[in-house]
């Protein structure tokens, strides 16, 4: 729910209801353009399940009057499921926590999957990865990161993960490992469309070598994937830096139709 809390008197207390994909549901802040601008800015807050304050308008393209808008969210934090209690997982759980994810680290090996090793994780689970995934809740905002690098864990886990309506599935390993990793799921009936969802090798090419650098690489890919970013330097692009969210574009198309 977006509510005008500061601006010209005729706009005060106007509200706009937004859905999880940032498309508008009901109400208005003062016009279609202002509504679309607000929806675009609130997408990150909605994904993170956070409240916040945004500024809308003050220009001819959206609304001549500048509006201060308070965004109330009614959603839990998105989940990041990290499989494999390795050093990279410790750095990734810290980065995920920083980005507002509810982080779970899962590994079947009791000696490695301990809260002491992953202080930034909300949950540390000792279980076979595919069994835990089968029993836990996921949604379109969930990011699944497979760092186990072991076929006996990877294959059943990826087979399940790629069939679920999650936002991101990535797996660590070399290109050769990736090629081998695709064979077994195919034999088990995983479709080509499902395999195409797999981000492997995981992360963007940042030249990272350390666990911390690799965590930045992985989370950068997750962010780009969620917001349909290119992952390219902004200095190489043209046009607006902040593009409308996919849900906003869809809403605008429906309105135009």
List PLM regions with ranges.
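Short phosphate-binding/catalytic loops that engage adenosine nucleotides
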Residues: 101, 166, 190
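Short, well-ordered alpha-helical microsegments
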Residues: 89-90, 154-155, 178
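ADP-ribose/adenylate-binding Rossmann-like module
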Residues: 106, 143, 147-151, 159-185
């Amino acid at each position: 729910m977006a509510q005008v809390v500061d601006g010209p008197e005729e706009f005060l207390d106007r509200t706009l209801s937004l859905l999880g994909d940032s498309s508008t549901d009901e109400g208005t802040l003062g016009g279609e353009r202002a509504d679309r601008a607000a929806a675009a800015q609130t997408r990150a807050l909605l994904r993170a399940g956070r409240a916040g304050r945004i500024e809308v308008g003050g220009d001819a393209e959206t609304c001549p009057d500048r509006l201060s808008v308070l965004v109330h969210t009614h959603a839990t934090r998105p989940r990041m499921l990290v499989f494999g209690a390795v050093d990279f997982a410790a750095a990734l759980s810290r980065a995920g926590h920083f980005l507002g994810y509810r982080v779970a680290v899962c590994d079947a090996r009791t000696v490695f999957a301990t809260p002491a090793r992953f202080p930034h994780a909300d949950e540390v689970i000792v279980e076979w990865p595919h069994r835990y995934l089968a029993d836990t809740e996921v949604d379109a905002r969930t990011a699944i990161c497979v760092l186990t690098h072991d076929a006996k864990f990877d294959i059943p886990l990826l087979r399940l993960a790629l069939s679920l309506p999650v936002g991101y599935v990535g797996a660590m390993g070399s290109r050769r490992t990736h090629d081998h990793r695709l064979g077994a799921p195919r034999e088990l009936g995983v479709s080509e469309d499902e395999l195409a969802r797999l981000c492997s090798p995981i992360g963007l090419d940042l030249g990272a070598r350390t666990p911390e650098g690799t965590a930045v690489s992985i989370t950068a890919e997750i962010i780009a994937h969620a917001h349909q970013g290119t992952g390219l330097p902004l200095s190489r692009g043209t046009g607006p830096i902040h593009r409308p969210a996919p849900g906003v574009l869809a809403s605008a198309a429906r309105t135009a139709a």
